[in-house]
Design a protein with these regions (language model features):
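Structured soluble/peripheral alpha/beta segments that form catalytic or ligand/cofactor-binding pockets
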Residues: 1-135
Length: 135
């Protein structure tokens, strides 16, 4: 795996919102400040103007964990970017997408909804690594 000794994996999101915005978010688990996670987002508006954000105000939380290939995989997430007015629920369309390659990972398409209203806001892609077998 292409990680430091302190990092256990990553969760990477590429989201295309219906209003034309595009959002990339990733979390490196471990290795951040005080041993915590490192979270980064990059938001592009419909005109192509970008804003980079670190961890300030951004919250990424697993909402649902499913058992996939003997691993506990987060298949539904909440991503909140208060400065951008976004509170998103991101859900895997096909949870059983574990790839048992040399660097094992989960990848698949996701749907994006407004957390409060459940209105469909877009689609995207999610890739996750570092989820170990947990018998």
């Amino acid at each position: 795996q292409l990680l430091t000794a302190e990092q256990t994996g990553w969760d990477w999101f590429s989201l295309h919102l219906n209003d034309g915005r595009k959002l990339m978010a990733y979390r490196l688990r471990g290795g951040g400040e005080d041993g915590g996670d490192y979270l980064f987002t990059h938001l592009m508006d419909a005109r192509g103007t970008t804003q980079q954000r670190g961890t300030d105000g951004v919250v990424l939380t697993p909402l649902e964990i499913q058992r996939v290939a003997r691993r506990d995989i987060p298949t539904t997430w909440q991503l909140t970017l208060p400065d951008a007015g976004l509170d998103l629920t991101i859900e895997a369309r096909h949870p059983n997408r574990w790839m048992p390659t040399t660097v094992p990972y989960w990848e698949g398409d996701v749907t994006v909804r407004d957390t409060a209203t459940q209105e469909a806001l877009g689609v995207g892609y999610l890739e996750m690594t570092g989820y170990e077998v947990n018998d």
